């Protein structure tokens, strides 16, 4: 689907507004969704536990998170617990169009008479389309009943509301600077256009929102920045730093999906190749382990000496980008930072080497610099481009335009590991919605006993049997027989 900003408009059927690629894909999406449900015991357990209680009744959740089959199970869990939901993807390439169709049609609808949830997402959005979808996700049909909860991945939905409110209070949307990214220019353009027609839209939404739950490292960083500046207008729960999210989704999910993305994108043999992983946090650990398991010769870059030492103890060389870039066959960024692989690094890469990102945003790789460099871009297939430098004749294979290759070139993390993350998201939404008066406008983490609850569900689903403490043993350790078993400062 390709449209211009001026021609974008939502479709409406059976009272549901939406914008997706193809409603006729719903049956395929529903079949995959049913399989995913069997692989997502955390979400299905929460449905059984809370279906009668309806703890999210009255919640109007605006969700910005990759519109995948696994996310479809999350959305239908939220609605099963009483919430109303509107959704958009948090990445221009990550939507699975059949999953989006299944959610709009719903379990009891048809493409002719959908009975599901409004979704605004399709694979391959332009930046203008992406931010239009984000606004639609946050714009509820009844202006007197705006969104009152946000479920976010990367912080774009939260940023749209908070920056919009900030500029409304200032009475002006600032102009874009010449060196601003293309996306920031589109973002400011959207806010400026909306300010001309409604000077209080985002303030009204911000005042209605009871809280936000954030999925990712990048989004959490944004939340802490808003809080430090005094600009966080509602409570936030940092889902990312739940142990059953960061130590599972970030590491084991990446370990699975990185290889999947490279294989689907390039069919290149990984064994024997020299691989450079930029960043050795939880995501980088999963990347390095995956590549090592394929027989690659792996090097790692790091700023933190503790992470660097961990990498070396696992047998990885710790190097700088400048030292290693010229010898690497595959380069993957996983830092959550910006300006990791710059144009001069790309020019130094081997002919036909592979470059991709599995952090969050495309600013880990200097895609803007590459586009301005005069290099010729040849599209090989969707989300696979060959960039050729005229002065050297060397070509570089870039995956997903520098955005998340595991979602752009493949289908993201597997259902079971996402069950951990999305169970945390659901619990966090319930926590903020039902106990809102216990939270200030700060960033919180879920309590340890809820983290252990999520883990316990998945241990049992895999057939594990937990040892139970005796009363004497529990007293000896200074914990309750039923947990939590570790202090908050414990490093898993």
Curated annotation (Swiss-Prot):
EC number(s) on file: 3.13.2.1
Question: GO molecular function: any one?
Answer: adenosylhomocysteinase activity
Segments spanning the bilayer are none
Q: In which pathway does it act?
A: Amino-acid biosynthesis; L-homocysteine biosynthesis; L-homocysteine from S-adenosyl-L-homocysteine: step 1/1
Q: State the free-text cofactor note.
A: Binds 1 NAD(+) per subunit.
Pfam family name, one: AdoHcyase_NAD
The GO annotation for biological process reads: L-homocysteine biosynthetic process; one-carbon metabolic process; S-adenosylmethionine cycle
- Per UniProt, substrate binds at 68, 153, 215, 245, 249
Q: Which residues bind NAD(+)?
A: 216-218, 250, 279-284, 302, 337, 358-360, 406
Show the Gene3D superfamilies listed in the entry: Adenosylhomocysteinase-like, NAD(P)-binding Rossmann-like Domain
Highest taxon of the lineage: Bacteria
Q: Which reaction does it catalyse?
A: S-adenosyl-L-homocysteine + H2O = L-homocysteine + adenosine
This protein's major location comes to cytoplasm
Identify which cofactors the protein needs according to its UniProt entry.
NAD(+)
- Keyword annotations of the record: Cytoplasm, Hydrolase, NAD, One-carbon metabolism
How is this protein annotated for GO cellular component?
cytosol
Q: Where in the cell is it found?
A: Cytoplasm
HAMAP family on file: AdoHcyase
- Protein task: May play a key role in the regulation of the intracellular concentration of adenosylhomocysteine.
* Family under the similarity heading: Belongs to the adenosylhomocysteinase family.
Q: What is this protein called?
A: Adenosylhomocysteinase
Q: Which organism is it from?
A: Mycobacterium marinum (strain ATCC BAA-535 / M)
């Amino acid at each position: 689907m390709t449209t211009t900003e001026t021609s974008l408009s939502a479709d409406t059927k059976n009272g549901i507004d939406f914008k997706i690629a193809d409603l006729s894909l719903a049956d395929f999406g529903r079949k995959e969704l049913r399989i995913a449900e069997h692989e997502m015991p955390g979400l299905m357990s929460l449905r059984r536990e809370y279906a009668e209680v309806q703890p999210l009744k009255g919640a109007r959740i605006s969700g910005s998170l990759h519109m995948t089959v696994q996310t479809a199970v999350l959305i239908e869990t939220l609605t099963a617990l009483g919430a109303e939901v509107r959704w958009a993807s948090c990445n221009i390439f990550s939507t699975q169009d059949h999953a989006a169709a299944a959610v709009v049609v719903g379990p009891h609808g048809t493409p002719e008479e959908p009975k599901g949830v409004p979704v605004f997402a399709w694979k391959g959005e332009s930046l203008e389309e992406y931010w239009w979808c984000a606004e639609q996700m946050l714009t509820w049909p009844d202006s007197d009943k705006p969104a009152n909860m946000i479920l976010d991945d990367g912080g774009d939905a939260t940023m749209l509301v908070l920056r919009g409110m900030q500029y409304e209070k200032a009475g002006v949307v600032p102009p874009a600077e010449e060196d601003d990214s293309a996306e920031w220019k589109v973002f400011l353009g959207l806010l400026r256009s909306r300010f001309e027609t409604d000077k209080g839209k985002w303030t009204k939404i911000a005042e209605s929102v009871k809280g936000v739950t954030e999925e990712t490292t990048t989004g959490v960083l944004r939340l802490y920045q808003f809080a430090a500046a005094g600009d966080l207008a509602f409570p936030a729960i940092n889902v990312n730093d739940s142990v059953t999210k960061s130590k599972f989704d970030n590491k084991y999910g990446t370990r699975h999906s990185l290889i999947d993305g490279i294989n689907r994108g390039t069919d290149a043999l990984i064994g024997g190749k020299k691989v450079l992983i930029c960043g050795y946090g939880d995501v980088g650990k999963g990347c390095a382990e995956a590549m090592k398991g394929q027989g690659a010769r792996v090097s790692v870059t790091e700023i933190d000496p503790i992470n660097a030492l961990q990498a070396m103890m696992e047998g990885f060389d710790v190097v700088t980008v400048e030292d290693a870039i010229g010898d690497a066959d595959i380069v993957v960024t996983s830092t959550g930072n910006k300006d990791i692989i710059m144009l001069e690094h790309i020019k130094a890469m081997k002919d036909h080497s592979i470059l991709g990102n599995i952090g969050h945003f495309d600013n880990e790789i200097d895609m803007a610099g590459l586009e301005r460099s005069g290099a010729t871009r040849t599209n090989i297939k969707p989300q696979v481009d060959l960039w050729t430098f005229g002065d050297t004749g060397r070509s570089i294979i870039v995956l997903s335009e520098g955005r998340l290759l595991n979602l752009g070139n493949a289908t993201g993390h597997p259902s079971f590991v996402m069950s951990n993350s999305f169970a945390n998201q659901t619990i966090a939404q319930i926590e903020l919605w039902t106990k809102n008066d216990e939270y200030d406008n700060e960033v919180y983490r879920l309590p340890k006993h809820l983290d252990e609850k999520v883990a316990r569900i998945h241990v049992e689903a895999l057939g594990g049997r937990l040892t139970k403490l005796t009363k004497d043993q529990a007293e000896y350790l200074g914990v309750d027989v039923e947990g939590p078993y570790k202090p908050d400062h414990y490093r898993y």
